């Protein structure tokens, strides 16, 4: 199975899971008093995690479509404070595991080490991790370049 087929299948399978109440209720008014903003360090980490999941090959990667910037908007505007905290905890978990396994921050590791770390930390039962993974796929697949690279139309 090539990368294009894999991304397409993942999108189809997780599509139903991904469209949750947050997106259905995103038009509802929300008090932003408790809204968090991703720091520059967390944005950089998210960009590198995104590129690890969807790397640039003969097609564009997640960094090229600015998946992290899109995710930051959704994070700030749609996620509840609890979901934001879960998401940040998942980002920190990846970085902490990188320090444990490879002795350095995730963003400083080689692509091969990043994949190794990511495979050790991924846990679909972790709400924050699942949200992060799904948002990366969603951001990529809803971008023009990501859609053109992944689907034939």
PLM-predicted stretches and their roles:
Residues 53, 57-65:
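Long, well-ordered alpha/beta core segments of mature domains
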Residues 28, 62-69:
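Short alpha-helical hairpin
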Residues 38-44, 61-62, 123-128:
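Structural motif
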Residues 1, 5, 21-56:
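C-terminal segment of N-terminal export signals and the immediately downstream linker at the start
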Residues 7-26, 110:
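N-terminal export signals
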Residues 48, 66-153:
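Mature-region segments of soluble proteins
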């Amino acid at each position: 199975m090539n990368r294009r087929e894999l991304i397409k299948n993942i999108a189809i399978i997780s599509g139903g899971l991904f469209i949750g109440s947050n997106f259905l209720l995103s038009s509802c008014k929300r008090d932003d008093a408790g809204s968090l903003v991703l720091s520059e360090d967390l944005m950089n980490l998210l960009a590198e995690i995104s590129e690890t999941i969807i790397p640039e090959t003969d097609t564009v990667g997640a960094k090229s479509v600015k998946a992290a910037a899109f995710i930051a908007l959704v994070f700030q505007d749609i996620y509840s404070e609890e979901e934001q905290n879960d998401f940040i905890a998942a980002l920190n978990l990846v970085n902490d595991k990188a320090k444990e396994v490879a002795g350095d921050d995730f963003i400083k590791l080689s692509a091969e080490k990043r994949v190794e770390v990511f495979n050790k930390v991924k846990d679909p039962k972790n709400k924050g991790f699942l949200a992060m993974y799904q948002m990366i796929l969603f951001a990529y697949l809803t971008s023009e370049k990501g859609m053109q690279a992944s689907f034939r139309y």
